[in-house]
């Protein structure tokens, strides 16, 4: 039977046949309209045309939804169920129970004791009395604390809002028990719904676990613990995995003799198959591997507890990474994914995978019929068929707050997690705070005496292990025996995305209405494919919503040789994906020396992204005399090189290269995106500039580079694409506007200008309001500069209006206290001053002046540079992104585009030139962080200030960079080599673009959004 919800039905429930529409009453229409508007905002960002299509996919009309949202009741024909909300609410009436002493560490724990004891009574009454022989009182208390902790975590934030006014804990508890808490539940019926749901999940999953433990205890002792004697359970620890499928999660079972085992409430046949495979391979393999021993049962199982232990000596660090490389070879062949830090435990010199559920992953389907997407899809397939897809190698992710974190089974820097903590719990001084979880144990890496091994130090060992084991697998047959017809987990979306939605659903501000609360989960609809009339994966969204509204992470499985995705209810959604077992067979057939060499190249590139060793400072010779031929030749050579690296399909091109992560200093191997900074728009702009030399192939390459982008701007999925991009002028939608505008000018192509205008109109008020970065690279400052460049070419009032909305957002926001062009005050000052010039608004000019004054206060006259405020230790950089170069360019640009105070600006330009000279030549040859940015400052200053010696200096320095490359074989990059550094701000396209600007001053300066 299903649970019956009384006071807070979700929108899915209300629109189902379980409910029926009632005649309307006064006020119902307003409530219905508010609910519908909230749904539209969540599902389509307020786009009513798109929202109507979303309704139609489920067979709804606006009129039907409004009628049901106005007034409805549970239908008499509705299926029978059980009403947990009734007895959960009734439990809080027990005042006597609340007077019992409580000395725990759960905030407001006193209030929840009646529910906990009522639920406990129901649980133990449903189990056999003999369970007391198996579970010691300490174990039963662990079970109890699990429910108490979950209930407290859910309710404490909303209770604290009320407690903060009283500040007397004893009086507050007396007031809330029972009347005050019951009134709270009446005011927020969703809170009661969630309390009932959590309690029901605890009852069902605990009953299931205890019953299974009682059934399997003898086998656990015999097959996993290797002990013949009986022992009782002393502790049960949870929190080792996200809750799935009705609150089920991994538990650690500790017996009174200290031995431990893991309970996993999911099918473990894939784990058992791995155990048999590794045991078979170890008999002949060049290096032995280890997996956890498994006791598989029907739909669940038990595994040995794998503890993190240190090496016997530092010599074992090398063997640890050889084994890690061997694991990568094996996992790559078996199409494993999601092998991040938490799924690997270092046991001495053995890296032990502890969760192999994402083995034999089916290929991701391409749902697009768009011919312009074929090149991108082909590039994405190359990445998904590489060792990067395993998740063992270091990579980077981006949090909701734009913080960059490292991921990967052999990564050393774990993501810093933020969590709610409480101080002075259950006292008058109790307070919550959000804290970073620091000093998390690096359990995935080998260690000795507190020192952890790193991949950077043992890369050759890792590569050796990979190569040796891959060649061993080439000569080994029947690898896939035992892997047919086994279920494997299918991760439909990143867990981090689900966590974001769960965070919203736990916010009590929407808990007064079940519909407005539940439509937050329909944010998923934004990610559907709206270019088609029907999205094959649309049915999965209902299952995702159902799980999320129970505060669970959605869970799906596929058969290893199948193509259908199965949800928790057993519903199968067919797909056209290539089955995982077929992919594994094909990989093993393709495995040869050439494939191994390519994968080793990928490994070394991934490892380079975590190498923080300082770049060698190479002397640069500036003695030669510059000639235009040298610059044209280098630009043409680079154009040819980038063109050869392209993946071409029909009229579109894509590249695999180093893409920046969240506008940060880190890069990783990926299919390049649409942006100007490191993506296709920047490459296209370089090709457009090179086309001015008369090169027809570069004109074709320029259009091919943005073909996919332009088609997406016109597609029904455009809102999702721009939401991922953000608004910024280097990495966001603003960068697209600027690139298309500049390309249209260089190529005399009005269609490109029309698409730039189309992109500008996608910068909606809602998207701008969501911008928290604010800077020129990723935020509103960059959007302003990009839009004003388009406005200069079109004079379109609607473009100017978008720019001024961005300026209002930037001027009214709390800007981050940083200096510099890319993320700091210089870029914001330039953008705001530019907006002030075109609008005549004093508030923008005042805000720009504040930014300049802030920057002046952080200038160090002795060093001739501005201090980098991102780090606590005194540090100075002379780059475009941070320091003198960018600040100087921003001030120079202000003299051209914006009204400014001449004396202050000119003084800053002089200081910037001094700082840039002291910082020359730096460690890299890029526009963003190195020599090319410094060259652009000299060139721009020479032209603006009519100082010929600066223009000459820029020319000589650029030639020196080219000559040094010719002597050493490559330019100096932030990460890796030229093969994957193809972008504009940090790659070859930037070198070529700088060369072209040397010979043609009509090519716009991209560093100031000219």
Q: What spans do the regions from the language model cover?
A:
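C-terminal catalytic region of ATP-dependent kinase domains
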Residues: 2-171, 177-214, 350-636
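Generic alpha-helix detector with strongest preference for long hydrophobic helices that associate
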Residues: 104, 108, 176, 180-183, ...
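Conserved ATP-binding subdomain of kinase catalytic cores across diverse folds
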Residues: 118-336, 341, 347-352, 357
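Glycan-recognition and catalytic cores of secretory/periplasmic carbohydrate-active enzymes
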Residues: 284-319, 330-368, 372-435, 454, ...
């Amino acid at each position: 039977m299903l649970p019956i919800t009384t006071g807070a039905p979700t929108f899915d429930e209300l629109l189902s046949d379980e409910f029926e529409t009632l005649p309307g009453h006064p006020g119902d229409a307003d409530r219905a309209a508010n609910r519908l508007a909230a749904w539209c905002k969540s599902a389509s960002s307020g786009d009513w045309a798109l929202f109507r299509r979303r309704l139609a996919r489920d067979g709804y009309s606006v009129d039907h939804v409004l009628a049901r949202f106005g007034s409805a009741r549970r239908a008499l024909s509705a299926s029978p169920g059980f009403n947990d909300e009734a007895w959960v609410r009734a439990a809080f009436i027990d005042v006597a129970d609340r007077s019992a002493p409580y000395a725990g560490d759960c905030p407001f724990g006193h209030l929840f004791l009646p529910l906990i004891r009522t639920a406990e009574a129901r649980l133990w009454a449903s189990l056999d009395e003999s369970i007391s022989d198996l579970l010691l009182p300490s174990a039963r208390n662990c079970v109890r604390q699990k429910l108490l902790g979950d209930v407290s975590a859910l309710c404490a934030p909303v209770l604290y809002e009320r407690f903060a006014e009283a500040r007397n804990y004893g009086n507050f508890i007396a007031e809330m028990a029972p009347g005050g808490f019951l009134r709270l539940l009446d005011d927020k019926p969703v809170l009661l719904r969630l309390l009932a749901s959590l309690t029901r999940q605890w009852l069902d999953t605990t009953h299931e676990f205890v019953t299974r433990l009682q059934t399997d205890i003898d086998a656990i002792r015999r097959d996993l613990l290797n002990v013949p004697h009986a022992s009782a359970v002393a502790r049960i620890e949870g929190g080792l995995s996200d809750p799935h499928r009705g609150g089920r999660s991994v538990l650690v079972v500790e017996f009174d003799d200290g031995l431990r085992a893991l309970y996993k409430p999911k099918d473990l046949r894939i784990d058992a198959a791995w155990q048999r495979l590794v045991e078979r391979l170890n008999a002949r393999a060049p290096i032995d591997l280890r997996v956890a021993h498994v006791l598989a049962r029907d739909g669940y199982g038990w595994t040995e507890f794998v503890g993190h232990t240190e090496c016997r000596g530092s010599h074992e660090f090398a063997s640890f990474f050889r084994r890690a490389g061997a694991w990568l070879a094996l996992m790559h062949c078996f199409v494993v994914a999601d092998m991040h830090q938490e799924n690997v435990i270092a046991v001495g010199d053995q890296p032990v995978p502890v969760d192999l559920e994402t083995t034999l992953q089916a290929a991701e389907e391409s749902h697009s019929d768009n011919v312009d997407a074929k090149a991108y899809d082909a590039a994405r397939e190359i990445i998904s068929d590489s060792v990067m897809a395993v998740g063992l190698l270091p990579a980077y992710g981006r949090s909701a707050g734009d913080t960059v974190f490292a991921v990967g089974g052999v990564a050393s820097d774990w993501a810093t997690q933020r969590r709610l903590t409480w101080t002075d719990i259950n006292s008058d001084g109790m307070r919550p705070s959000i804290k970073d979880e620091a000093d998390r144990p690096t359990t995935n890496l080998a260690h000795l005496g507190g020192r952890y091994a790193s991949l950077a130090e043992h890369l050759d060992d890792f590569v050796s292990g990979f190569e040796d084991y891959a060649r061993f697998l080439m000569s080994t047959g029947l690898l896939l025996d035992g892997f047919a017809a086994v279920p494997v987990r299918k991760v439909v979306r990143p867990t981090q995305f689900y966590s974001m939605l769960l965070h919203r659903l736990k916010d009590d501000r929407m808990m007064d209405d079940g519909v407005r609360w539940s439509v937050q989960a329909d944010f998923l609809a934004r990610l559907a494919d709206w270019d088609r009339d029907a999205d094959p994966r649309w049915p999965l969204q209902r299952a995702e919503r159902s799980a999320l509204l129970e505060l669970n992470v959605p869970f799906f499985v596929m058969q290893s040789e199948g193509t259908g995705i199965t949800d928790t209810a057993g519903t199968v959604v067919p797909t056209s994906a290539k089955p995982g077992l077929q992919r594994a067979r094909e990989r093993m057939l393709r495995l040869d020396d050439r494939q191994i060499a390519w994968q080793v190249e990928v490994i070394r590139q991934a490892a380079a992204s975590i190498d923080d060793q300082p770049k060698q400072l190479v002397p640069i010779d500036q003695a030669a005399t510059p000639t235009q031929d040298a610059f044209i030749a280098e630009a043409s050579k680079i154009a040819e090189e980038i063109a050869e690296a392209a993946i071409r399909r029909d009229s579109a091109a894509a590249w695999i290269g180093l893409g920046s992560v969240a506008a940060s200093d880190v890069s990783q191997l990926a299919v390049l995106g649409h942006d100007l900074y490191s993506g296709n728009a920047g490459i296209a702009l370089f090709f457009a500039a090179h086309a001015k030399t008369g090169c027809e192939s570069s004109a074709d390459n320029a259009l091919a580079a943005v073909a996919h982008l332009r088609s997406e701007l016109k597609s029904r999925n455009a809102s999702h694409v721009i939401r991922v991009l953000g608004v910024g002028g280097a990495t966001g939608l603003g960068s697209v506007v600027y690139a298309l505008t500049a390309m249209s000018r260089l190529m005399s192509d009005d269609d490109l200008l029309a698409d730039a205008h189309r992109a500008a109109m996608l910068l909606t008020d809602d998207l701008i309001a969501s911008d928290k970065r604010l800077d020129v690279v990723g935020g509103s400052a960059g959007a302003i500069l990009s839009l004003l460049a388009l406005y200069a070419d079109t004079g379109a009032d609607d473009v100017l209006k978008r720019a001024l909305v961005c300026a209002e957002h930037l001027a009214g926001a709390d800007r981050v206290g940083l200096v510099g062009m890319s993320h700091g005050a210089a870029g914001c000052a330039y953008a705001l001053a530019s907006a002030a010039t075109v609008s005549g608004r004093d508030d923008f000019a005042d805000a720009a002046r504040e930014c300049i004054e802030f920057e002046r206060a952080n200038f160090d006259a002795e060093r001739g540079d501005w201090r980098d405020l991102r780090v606590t230790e005194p540090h100075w950089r002379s780059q475009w992104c941070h320091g003198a170069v960018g600040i100087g360019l921003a001030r120079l640009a202000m003299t051209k585009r914006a009204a400014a105070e001449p004396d202050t600006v000119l003084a800053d330009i002089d200081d910037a030139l001094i700082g840039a000279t002291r910082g020359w030549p730096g460690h890299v040859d890029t526009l963003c962080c190195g020599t090319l940015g410094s060259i652009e400052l000299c060139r721009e200053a020479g032209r603006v200030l009519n100082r010929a010696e600066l223009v000459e200096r820029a020319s000589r320095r650029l030639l020196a960079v080219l000559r040094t490359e010719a002597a050493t074989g490559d330019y100096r990059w932030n990460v890796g080599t030229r093969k994957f550094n193809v972008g504009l701000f940090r790659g070859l396209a930037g070198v070529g673009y700088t060369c072209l600007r040397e010979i043609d001053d009509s090519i716009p300066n991209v560093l100031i959004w000219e």
